[in-house]
UniProtKB/Swiss-Prot annotation:
Predominant cellular place of this UniProt entry's protein: membrane
UniProt gene name: atpD
The name this protein goes by in its record: ATP synthase subunit beta
Pfam (any one): ATP-synt_ab_N
Keywords: ATP synthesis, ATP-binding, Cell membrane, CF(1), Hydrogen ion transport, Ion transport, Membrane, Nucleotide-binding, Translocase, Transport
Location in or out of the cell: Cell membrane
Residue stretches in coiled coil: none
C-alpha cells in the first residue's frame, strides 16, 4: 500500500504527494486520510499532476484537515455492499449504513462504483408498457418497462411528489426490487420517503442511498453511481427486474461543475464542466436492460429557471425513452400533476406498442388541445363569441380534457384531503374516448377537476347540481 501526505486543501479538493519510489494511485482510486482522532476521510483520485502528486475529491467534509496528514492508498475504487443485505437499509455514498440499524455483515459482497456499461451484445429491448395509474402519463407519454424516463420541471412544480406517487403506484404493485437514490435533494424529503416506505411495507424490497444537499460535491457527484451499482447487481447477479429512482439527476451535473474549476478545467457553456456530456453518458449508459434482467429508471431533472435549453437538462434529454414535462402555467391553474400534455413525449406512443385505439385517442386528445392553444389568442382578444360553433365545441371539450388530465395523488392526501386515485390504462382510454365523442359535453367543467375515472365526474356533477 502506498502512503503519502496531504500537501494542499482547497475546499473539497485535496492534493496528496507520494514520495518517489512509491506507486502513484490510479485515477478513481479511493484514498484514506487519517484525521488523527480515530476518524478517516475518504477521497477519490481525479487527476495525476506529476511528480508523485495527485488531486483528489473528498467524499465528506474537509474540516480539520492539515498539511502533512498521512494518506493511504486502498488500491481500489470506492466499493459498496450489494445484494440482499442492502434491502431495507439506507446508505451514504461510501456504502456505509446511516439508519442506525447496525453494520452490514463483513462477508457481504462489495462492488466498485466505477464499472463499464454492458456490451452491445448483452442489451435487450422491451416494448412492454409499464402502467403507472396516472392518466396523463399512461395516455399521452406511456412508460416502457426497462426504459429510461425523465421528469423535467423547474423549482416547485411537483417533480418529487410525482416520483413519490410513481413509487407508491409502481413499487407497491411491482414485486421486484427498487433502489432509490437521493442526489443533492432535501434531507427532509428523504426522511419522509423512508418513513412512508416503512409504513407501506415497500421498504423491505428497497435499497436507499442518499447524498443530500448538505453533503460536499464529491458525495453528490458519486452517490448516483453507488445506487446504480446496487441496482446493477440485482439485475446481473440475480436476474431481477429493478426500479431505479433518481432524484435529482441535475444535482449530479451541478456537483461536477462545482469541483470542475477547482480541478483546473476550463469551464464550458454557462459555466458547466467541459466533460458534462461524457460524465452524463458514463452514468446513463450503465442504466440499461440486459438479457439477464431489466432496470427501469425514473429520473427527476431540475430545469434551471425553466430553461430547457440549459446544457444540463438538454444533455439528459438525449438518453431518455420518455419525457414527462411539468409546466408552471398548469400549476397556476390548479391542474395537478402539472404535466404538459403537448410537450411530454414517449417512444412507446406507437400503435404497435399501445394498440390502435389507444394511439388514436391519444393523438386526438393532443390535436384537440393543440387547436385550443391556437385559438387562445383569438379568445383573449375577441372573446368566445367570434368563434364558429365547431371551434366553440373544440374549446369546451379541450377544457374538459385539460381538467380531466388532473387527478388526486395518494401521497398528497394529507395536503388535499382527497383520496388518491389509481386509474388503469384501459379505463383512461375509454374515458377520454367518451369525452372526445361528446358524451359529457353537458356536464360542468369543474366536475372534471381532480377526479379518477369518468364515473366520478358524473357523480361530482350530480352533487354540484344539488
Amino acid at each position: 500500500m502506498s502512503t503519502g501526505k496531504v500537501v494542499q486543501v482547497i475546499g473539497p479538493v485535496v492534493d496528496v504527494a507520494f514520495e518517489s519510489g512509491q506507486q502513484v494511485p490510479d485515477i478513481n482510486n479511493a484514498l484514506k486520510i487519517d484525521k488523527g482522532d480515530g476518524q478517516t476521510l475518504t477521497v477519490e483520485v481525479s487527476l495525476a499532476l506529476g511528480d508523485g502528486i495527485v488531486r483528489t475529491i473528498a467524499m465528506d467534509s474537509t474540516d480539520g484537515l492539515q498539511r502533512g496528514m498521512s494518506v493511504t492508498d486502498t488500491g481500489d475504487a470506492i466499493k459498496v455492499p450489494v445484494g440482499e443485505a442492502t434491502l431495507g437499509r439506507v446508505f451514504n455514498v461510501l456504502g456505509e449504513p446511516v439508519d442506525n440499524n447496525g453494520e452490514i455483515a463483513a462477508e457481504t459482497p462489495r462492488h466498485s462504483i466505477h464499472r463499464d456499461a454492458p456490451s452491445y451484445d448483452d442489451l435487450a429491448n422491451s416494448t412492454e408498457i409499464l402502467e403507472t395509474g396516472i392518466k396523463v402519463i399512461d395516455l399521452l407519454a406511456p412508460y416502457v418497462r426497462g426504459g429510461k424516463i425523465g421528469l423535467f420541471g423547474g423549482a416547485g412544480v411537483g417533480k418529487t411528489v410525482l416520483i413519490q406517487e410513481l413509487i407508491h403506484n409502481i413499487a407497491q404493485g411491482h414485486n421486484g426490487i427498487s433502489v432509490f437514490t437521493g442526489v443533492g435533494e432535501r434531507t427532509r424529503e428523504g426522511n419522509d420517503m423512508y418513513h412512508e416506505m416503512a409504513e407501506s411495507g415497500v421498504l423491505k424490497q428497497t435499497a436507499m442511498v442518499y447524498g443530500q444537499m448538505n453533503e460536499p460535491p464529491g458525495a453528490r457527484m458519486r452517490v448516483a453511481l453507488t445506487g446504480l451499482t446496487m441496482a446493477e447487481n440485482f439485475r446481473d447477479s440475480e436476474g431481477k427486474d429493478v426500479l431505479l429512482f433518481i432524484d435529482n439527476i441535475f444535482r449530479f451535473t451541478q456537483a461536477g461543475s462545482e469541483v470542475s474549476a477547482l480541478l483546473g478545467r476550463i469551464p464550458s457553456a454557462v459555466g458547466y464542466q467541459p466533460t458534462l456530456a461524457t460524465e452524463m453518458g458514463q452514468l446513463q449508459e450503465r442504466i440499461t436492460s440486459t438479457k439477464k434482467g431489466s432496470v427501469t429508471s425514473i429520473q427527476a431533472v431540475y430545469v434551471p429557471a425553466d430553461d430547457y435549453t440549459d446544457p444540463a437538462p438538454a444533455t439528459t434529454f438525449a438518453h431518455l425513452d420518455a419525457t414527462t414535462n411539468l409546466e408552471r402555467a398548469l400549476t397556476q391553474q390548479g391542474i395537478y400533476p402539472a404535466v404538459d400534455p403537448l410537450a411530454s413525449t414517449s417512444s412507446a406512443l406507437d400503435p404497435q406498442v399501445v394498440g390502435q385505439e389507444h394511439y388514436e385517442v391519444a393523438t386526438e386528445v393532443q390535436r384537440t388541445l393543440q387547436r385550443y392553444r391556437e385559438l387562445q389568442d383569438i379568445i383573449s382578444i375577441l372573446g368566445m363569441d367570434e368563434l364558429s360553433d365547431e371551434e366553440k365545441t373544440t374549446v369546451n371539450r379541450a377544457r374538459r380534457i385539460q381538467f380531466f388530465l388532473s387527478q388526486p395523488f395518494s401521497v398528497a392526501e394529507t395536503f388535499t384531503g382527497i383520496n388518491g386515485e389509481y386509474v388503469p390504462v384501459a379505463e383512461t382510454v375509454r374515458s377520454f374516448k367518451e369525452i372526445l365523442d361528446g358524451k359529457y359535453d353537458d356536464l360542468p367543467e369543474d366536475a372534471f377537476r381532480n377526479v379518477g375515472a369518468i364515473e366520478q365526474v358524473v357523480e361530482k356533477a350530480k352533487t354540484m347540481a344539488q
